[in-house]
Amino acid sequence: MVFRNLFFVPYGWFKLCWYASHAERYSEEQRYQLLKYVDNRAVKGGNLVIDGHGMENIPKENGFIFFPNHQGLFDVLAIIQVCPVPFSVVAKKELTNVPFLKQVFACMKAFMIDRDDVKQSMQVIINVIKEVKAGRNYLIFAEGTRSKDGNHPQLSLIHI
């Protein structure tokens, strides 16, 4: 994957860092198109084929939340690949220490949640609810972390 994108990686990294540090200059659609472009390069470089099903179930109007199970590290890339509308994410704050993810989250204007701080977590939830009601879309992995063994906890309905 790296060899196939050898010349793209420096350009893509610079552009992603620029968009992340100047996110307010670009519309959500422009930032999402950059992420889709980077995602497409990663998918093609890895000789992967993503076959999405159920896109007709994605609401036509903005202001919704995806609540998928977190199967593995490729989940968000697969969702970006098939989702036609921009979305942001709620992620654990520890991921801001990971290069590349830090820039992706800044570009998406993601909310970072501290799972050890209940007050901060509640404030993030309140802010996400306000943004969803204002028409922004979000992706939240409800069980909190990816499944390393394929077993997921039983989830119940969440009402906003």
Describe the role of every protein-language-model region.
Residues 45, 49-158:
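Soluble catalytic domains of membrane acyltransferases
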Residues 1-64:
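Membrane-anchoring hydrophobic helices of lipid-metabolizing enzymes
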